[in-house]
């Protein structure tokens, strides 16, 4: 990299819209008014025959409301007597297990450093960590695989983690049918007594294009080498992609039949989503992860973020690819100014308000990353990316919300990002804001307040599957309290075990067994405390969920942190520190790219087939691009953003029309009706041809996420 290029990535003036303040002062003023509005008081009276709001004489002592009521703890003497002794015993045992776990991990670290990584393999391994782009990293990974003899493993079809016999036969069948179909297309000759080869090809594709068919998407198949997977698995992926492209281009099948074919494949195969976890300033590692995926054209269109990850997700979802390539550089640190206040300032604020940071100042700083008061629907129409932000209500018993352009299209993104980052003691709960038809802001969802989504749903996998059929998740996990306990005893994707040619156990079988036992025992006792309602609720929050929820996905990226990150956990990064975090984020994503590429090869081929064959008009859903063209906007040629916009499967969005969305906004904003109620009213005017059970399930589930109930397990 030249000196001018290096200087450019550190120059804040090279950032797009660096000096531009997107948010209007009136938006901040309305947000401040919404925060200061008093909660609506219910009608109260001493009894049925006294007047309401009668003046009541104050008692001398202030009565504290109980943390838990009898509805939760039930009545009983033993609960009161045994609660605190049992809680002390369990917490003491968990502390002992924690110390034992740290010692076990230290033993495994020493074992790997002094037994496994020695000699030439150590020097080749060091080359992986100094590469700045995926091409050079892949060369270094292939050299390490060649030294360890991993290429021989790729050539052998047999493996316990997938059905190699079925895949081998299937590849041969697909290749033969594709060649026959190509011959028929070029010579335009089809035997009248037989069906075209392309129809037989479609039949086989409908049987095999499914999520993790025959185990070909098992992460274990990518966890025994540093680069790539089995040759047979790679041949299968490439052959399926070629067959899908052939079907889309074939003239022997009508567009309507091809559309239904690709729609069926899409339903079975599902979608891919990028999930960015919370973690305070650890979330800046996400910039490097996103940069690595963007540079290699494997950045999914569905993105979800929580807490600090929501800020990164908002930046990604509101910018185009070209803008992101200019923004994801160390100079971005000059725009991260949320923690610039001194010690005395935030101590006084915390003593006065119970929160370290000022909500209005954070709203002003956050608005630049969200391009002002952009809504979820406006971001989707601008970039084609689907942004999701997880928020938790202040009431510990209410369900969480996954805000996106379907559940809350007119919700302002920066308000959702603030709510998702409102950790108790750091930032007070926040009111979500919605944009009305005239462009002004108003409180959303009856003015209820929301807080940090990481407290209950850091990775909202269930809601993503419900709304967008997501069944393949790429999780970038940076929560510091979770990274300590992440341990893959049999290796991870692109990170095989260091000895026995990747077929052994980390730290030996004994070390891995002890680690697993201690970790599972700690998890068991935490669940016991939660189910027996023994844990206190500081600040009105059940803190057990920050340990017991699921934090991983199909592919989990764990950026490597350093001890100084804990010291700067609530501090703005310098350009030099952000440069290191971006580099480490890229390094952690490089081993996963080949796995993600193979997944997206098939997914993008299906989406492209849907785009090419989708009927125009006819009462079907309208994509945002078609909507703009129909209304006289954007009469020029379709650009790549519009092309990607049409690929986001509009058939899942229901009747996507401007009139329907305007009615939804009017009802939600002016009448105080939330989007779920507005959707129900809309459905009453336009009934769908679904069964009663499906319709009731869709209406009840469209707004809420991750309900802890057995009824959701079958979805």
Swiss-Prot record:
Active site (UniProt): 307, 452
Keywords: Hydrolase, Lipid degradation, Lipid metabolism, Membrane, Transmembrane, Transmembrane helix
Domain annotation PNPLA: ranges: 274-465
Membrane-spanning segments: 84-104
PROSITE patterns: PNPLA
GO cellular component annotations of the record: lipid droplet; membrane
UniProt function note: Probable lipid hydrolase.
UniProt-recorded name of the protein: Patatin-like phospholipase domain-containing protein ATEG_02594
């Amino acid at each position: 990299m030249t000196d001018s290029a290096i200087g450019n990535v550190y120059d804040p003036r090279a950032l797009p819209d660096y000096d531009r303040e997107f948010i209007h002062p009136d938006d901040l003023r309305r947000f401040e008014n919404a925060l200061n509005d008093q909660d609506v008081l219910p009608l109260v009276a001493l009894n049925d025959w006294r007047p309401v709001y009668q003046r009541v004489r104050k008692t001398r002592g202030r009565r504290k409301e109980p943390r838990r009521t009898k509805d939760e703890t039930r009545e009983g003497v033993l609960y009161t007597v045994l609660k605190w002794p049992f809680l002390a015993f369990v917490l003491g045992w968990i502390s002992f297990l924690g110390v034992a776990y740290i010692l076990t991990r230290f033993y495994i670290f020493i074992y790997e450093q002094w037994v496994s990584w020695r000699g030439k393999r150590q020097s080749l391994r060091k080359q992986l960590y100094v590469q700045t782009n995926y091409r050079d990293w892949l060369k270094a990974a292939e050299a390490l695989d060649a030294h360890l003899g991993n290429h021989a493993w790729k050539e052998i079809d047999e493996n316990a983690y997938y059905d190699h016999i079925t895949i081998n036969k299937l590849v041969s069948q697909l290749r033969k049918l594709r060649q026959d179909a190509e011959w028929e297309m070029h010579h335009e000759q089809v035997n009248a007594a037989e069906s075209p080869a392309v129809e037989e090809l479609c039949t086989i594709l409908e049987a095999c294009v499914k999520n993790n068919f025959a185990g070909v998407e098992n992460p274990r198949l990518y966890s025994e080498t540093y680069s790539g997977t089995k040759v047979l698995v790679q041949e299968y992926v490439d052959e399926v992609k070629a067959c899908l492209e052939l079907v889309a281009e074939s003239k022997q099948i009508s567009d309507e039949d091809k559309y239904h074919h690709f729609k069926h494949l899409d339903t079975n195969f599902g979608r891919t989503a990028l999930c960015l976890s919370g973690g305070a300033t650890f979330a800046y590692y996400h910039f490097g992860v996103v940069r690595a995926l963007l540079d290699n054209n494997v950045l999914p269109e569905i993105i979800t973020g929580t807490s600090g990850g929501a800020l990164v997700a908002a930046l990604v979802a509101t910018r185009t690819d070209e803008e992101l390539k200019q923004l994801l550089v160390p100079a971005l640190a000059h725009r991260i100014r949320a923690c610039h206040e001194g010690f005395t300032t935030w101590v006084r604020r915390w003593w006065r308000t119970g929160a370290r940071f000022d909500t209005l100042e954070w709203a002003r700083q956050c608005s630049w990353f969200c391009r002002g008061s952009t809504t979820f629907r406006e971001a989707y129409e601008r970039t084609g990316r689907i942004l999701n932000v997880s928020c938790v209500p202040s009431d510990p018993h209410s369900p969480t919300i996954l805000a996106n352009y379907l559940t809350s299209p007119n919700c302002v993104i920066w308000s959702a990002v603030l709510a998702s980052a409102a950790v108790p003691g750091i930032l007070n709960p926040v009111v979500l804001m919605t944009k009305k038809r005239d462009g002004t802001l108003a409180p959303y969802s009856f003015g209820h307040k929301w807080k940090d989504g990481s407290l209950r749903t850091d990775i909202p996998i269930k809601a993503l599957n419900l709304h967008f059929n997501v069944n393949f998740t790429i999780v970038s996990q940076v929560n510091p309290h979770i990274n300590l306990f992440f341990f893959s005893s049999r290796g991870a994707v692109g990170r095989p075990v260091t000895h026995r040619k990747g077929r052994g156990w980390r730290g030996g079988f004994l070390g891995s067994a002890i680690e697993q036992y201690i970790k599972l025992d700690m998890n068991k006792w935490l669940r016991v405390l939660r189910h027996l309602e023994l844990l206190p609720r500081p600040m009105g929050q059940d803190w057990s969920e920050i340990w017991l929820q699921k934090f991983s996905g199909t592919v989990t990226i764990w950026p490597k942190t350093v001890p100084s990150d804990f010291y700067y956990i609530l501090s703005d990064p310098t350009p030099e520190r952000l440069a290191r975090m971006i580099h480490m984020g890229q390094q952690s994503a490089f081993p996963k790219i080949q796995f993600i590429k193979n997944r997206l090869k098939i997914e993008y081929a299906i989406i492209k087939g849907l785009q090419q064959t989708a009927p125009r008009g006819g009462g079907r859903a309208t994509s945002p691009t078609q909507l703009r063209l129909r209304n006289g906007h954007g009469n020029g040629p379709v650009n790549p953003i519009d092309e990607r916009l049409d690929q986001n499967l509009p058939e899942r969005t229901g009747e996507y029309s401007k009139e329907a969305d305007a009615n939804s906004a009017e009802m939600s904003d002016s009448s105080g009706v939330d989007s779920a109620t507005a959707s129900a009213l809309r459905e009453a005017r336009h009934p769908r041809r679904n069964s009663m059970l499906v319709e009731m399930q869709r209406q009840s589930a469209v707004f809420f996420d991750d309900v802890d109930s057995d009824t959701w397990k079958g979805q």
